[in-house]
Design a protein with these regions (language model features):
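Alpha-helical elements of Rossmann-like donor-binding domains used by nucleotide-donor carbohydrate transfer enzymes
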Residues: 13, 34, 38, 67, ...
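Hydrophobic/aromatic-rich alpha-helical bundle segments in the mid-to-C-terminal region
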Residues: 84-88, 118-166, 175
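Short, basic, alpha-helical segments at the C-terminal edge of helix-turn-helix-like DNA-binding modules
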Residues: 11, 41-48
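Hydrophobic alpha-helical connector segments
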Residues: 38, 49-78, 132-136
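Short coil/turn segments at alpha/beta junctions that flank glycine-rich nucleotide-binding fingerprints
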Residues: 3-7, 58, 79, 118
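Short helix-capping/turn signature of helix-turn-helix
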Residues: 29, 88-92
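Helix-turn-helix
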Residues: 2-34, 38
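Amphipathic alpha-helical packing segments from all-alpha helical-bundle domains
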Residues: 45-48, 75, 94-120, 129-137, ...
């Protein structure tokens, strides 16, 4: 799906790549749309597990955020078509896209609430934490260009990580 995009991926292509008969496809999915609707949420859960495992090694909010940020980009190296799947989903699998956004939003909200409860960040209301959540989510999307500028799938440059972390540290610690 990631190679060709949602529009150009057929059931024939999917089954050929998976090495299964088309009938087998229908044992697992009701339709082409069904697989489109399941793809992003499943991949999103894998991404959150990967990022969470990376972030869990940190002791503070800022350490966990840096490790999670780096973990997100290491996930992209494993799944280079993730951004294409994510960016095409609003048009081809809008329910899946909304489910994915909600899953990521809830994860970040939990992370930020816990940090606020532990005194690591101050001065943010619940509504403001939601804004922060979307800012952090968007940063990953747009800073991804530094890992794939020339169409390759590179590591995120360290200076980008440092700039991101500086913004997060100064933005969240002052309140």
């Amino acid at each position: 799906m990631g190679e060709k995009g949602y529009q150009d991926t057929s059931i024939t292509f999917i089954t050929q790549r998976a090495g299964v008969a088309q009938g087998t496809f229908y044992n697992h999915f009701e339709s082409r749309q069904d697989i489109l609707d399941q793809l992003l949420p499943a991949l999103g859960k894998d991404m959150l597990e990967h990022v969470g495992a990376c972030a869990s090694k940190g002791k503070t909010l800022f350490e966990r955020e840096e490790l999670g940020f780096r973990g997100f980009f290491s996930f992209l190296r494993i799944h280079p078509h993730f951004f294409r799947i994510l960016n095409e989903a609003p048009s081809f699998a809008p329910k899946a896209y909304e489910a994915h956004l909600e899953l990521v939003r809830e994860g970040y909200m939990h992370f930020l609430r816990k940090a606020r409860g532990g005194g690591e960040i101050r001065g943010f209301s619940e509504r403001e934490l939601e804004v922060v959540t979307y800012v952090l989510m968007s940063a990953r999307l747009y800073l991804g260009r530094y890992a794939s500028q020339d169409g390759s799938n590179n590591e995120i440059p360290d200076w980008v990580v440092k700039a991101y972390c500086k913004l997060i540290r100064h933005g969240l610690s002052g309140g």
